[in-house]
């Protein structure tokens, strides 16, 4: 009985220490996700305007509602649904390792699977929808731009050729500006996520290494709890990386928009 009381006392202290560091990691993950989302909300209207000026009116019209909805809704899903699921799983691991008789392993695994599945569904749906609509609208814009240039060149007397060249010049310069803004956007996202990701990777490594080192000399429940904390940090890290990946792909697609202009 004394051994059980002593274990639970040590376990309670360990839980408090692990919870403190895990809450810090949650705060870091939320700040990064919200920071990237705020930056995308600021830069996207500029990029959409440049796409429209470069002749990609259909692309701008179709991408804009998808993009703005994604920038608002996806980070909110991560912050209000996925991260709380990770937190619940983290807490349940403590309860699971408190007793040797009564276990909830399957419930913990189920929550972990839900977290991974939701992220996978969001990433796949977002990238597939964005790619399909981008390809379709690119074809429409290419035909529309060539038709406009042909009509101006052939049906406006004397100055038609000059107007046609002016349209191409404005579209080309808009394309250059858009590509520069997209490149800057990619670099800013890297700067936003770099330090937090390094911090979370190091914390995960510390917990995994700690679990490996104390395993020969400690109760298996303590080892399991420390390892589970590392697993929860991996899930948090996946949230930050998946949101960043989606916005990376978004900027890359927008950077490639309007390339049909080059060469007339």
Regions found by a protein language model. Give the residues of each.
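Short, small-residue-biased leader/transition segments that mark boundaries at the very start
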Residues: 1-6
């Amino acid at each position: 009985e004394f051994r059980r009381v002593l274990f639970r006392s040590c376990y309670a202290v360990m839980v408090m220490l692990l919870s403190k560091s895990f809450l810090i990691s949650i705060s870091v993950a939320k700040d990064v996700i919200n920071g990237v989302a705020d930056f995308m909300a600021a830069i996207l209207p500029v990029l959409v305007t440049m796409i429209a000026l470069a002749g990609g009116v259909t692309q701008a019209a179709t991408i804009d509602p998808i993009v703005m909805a994604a920038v608002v809704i996806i980070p909110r899903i991560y912050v209000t649904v996925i991260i709380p699921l990770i937190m619940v799983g983290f807490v349940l691991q403590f309860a699971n390792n408190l007793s040797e008789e009564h276990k909830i392993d399957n419930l913990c695994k189920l929550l972990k699977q839900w977290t991974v599945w939701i992220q996978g569904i969001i990433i796949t749906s977002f990238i597939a929808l964005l790619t399909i609509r981008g390809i379709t609208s690119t074809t429409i814009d290419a035909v529309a731009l060539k038709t406009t240039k042909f009509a101006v060149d052939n049906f406006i007397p004397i100055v038609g050729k000059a107007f046609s060249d002016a349209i191409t010049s404005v579209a080309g310069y808009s394309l250059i500006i858009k590509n520069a803004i997209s490149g800057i956007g990619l670099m800013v996202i890297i700067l936003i996520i770099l330090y937090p990701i390094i911090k979370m990777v190091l914390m995960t490594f510390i917990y995994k290494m700690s679990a490996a080192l104390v395993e020969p000399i400690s109760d298996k429940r303590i080892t399991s709890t420390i390892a589970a904390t590392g697993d929860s940090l991996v899930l948090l890290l996946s949230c930050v990386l998946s949101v960043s990946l989606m916005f990376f792909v978004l900027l890359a697609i927008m950077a490639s928009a309007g390339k049909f202009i080059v060469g007339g």
